[in-house]
Amino acid sequence: SASIKNNFSFCWYQFYKFLFIFTNRWRKEVVDLETFCVGILVMLNASHNKDFKIKDLNLKSYQKLVMSSDNKGLNAMSISDITGIPRPTVVRKLKYLIKNNFLHINNKKLISIDIKGNTYKRSTNLQNQNMISLSNFIFRVFNQIKVINSN
């Protein structure tokens, strides 16, 4: 705790450095951060489904498992209410994500995660790059605050 206080600015600098790298990667993939927020909200809804339980912590299988976990989905109005983004804008962002094979809309107009084809390969690559960046962030912070004992 004292070590974190002594390195407070360093820790925040490393965190923001990671956050900017993470968001810039996704912004390049999905055009803007509002689209990313809409997509990540649908992903969070799927991963926080009470029926979604992971027995084996495996990054490669996680993305496939989370896609089949949400049998209901979210509607555009709910996404708008949660994010504060106007509904017409949410609808435009959803159309972009559906057209680019990130999301799926069912006959009840509910949106769920469904990453397919080339988009799946690109998002898996982004996920891997972001995990490396997260690991680097954790390594730098833990190394700086001397959490890991070298003895």
Report each predicted region and the residues it spans.
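Short, amphipathic alpha-helical interaction segments positioned at domain boundaries
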Residues: 1, 119-150
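Key DNA-contact positions within bacterial/archaeal DNA-binding proteins
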Residues: 36, 88-89, 95
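N-terminal leader segment of winged-helix/HTH proteins
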Residues: 1-37
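A short alpha-helical element within helix-turn-helix/winged-helix DNA-binding domains
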Residues: 66, 71-81, 97
